[in-house]
């Protein structure tokens, strides 16, 4: 079992956790429908960069 020999300080703990922060999703508004969607992804209506790419 891995058990540490010495206690880690609050500073070292914080440095380790510095990369754990979450970022917000990059959202865009579609020009044709005005729908909010993830960047570089097709909208629910099937539009990508203003063009219809998927027919439902």
Swiss-Prot record:
The lineage of its organism: Bacteria, Pseudomonadati, Pseudomonadota, Gammaproteobacteria, Vibrionales. It holds the Pfam family Ribosomal_L32p. GO terms for biological process: translation. InterPro entries: Ribosomal_bL32, Ribosomal_bL32_bact, Ribosomal_zn-bd. It comes from Vibrio parahaemolyticus serotype O3:K6 (strain RIMD 2210633). GO terms for molecular function: structural constituent of ribosome. Residues 1-16 have a biased composition (Basic residues). Disulfide bonds: none annotated. Belongs to the bacterial ribosomal protein bL32 family. The keyword Ribonucleoprotein applies. The keyword Signal does not apply. Keywords: Ribonucleoprotein, Ribosomal protein. This is Large ribosomal subunit protein bL32. Residues 1-28 are annotated as: Disordered.
């Amino acid at each position: 079992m891995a058990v540490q020999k010495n206690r880690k300080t609050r500073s070292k703990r914080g440095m380790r956790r510095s990369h754990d922060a979450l970022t917000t999703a990059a959202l865009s508004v579609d020009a044709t429908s005005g729908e909010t969607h993830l960047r570089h992804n097709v909208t629910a209506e099937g539009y990508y960069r203003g063009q219809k790419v998927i027919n439902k």
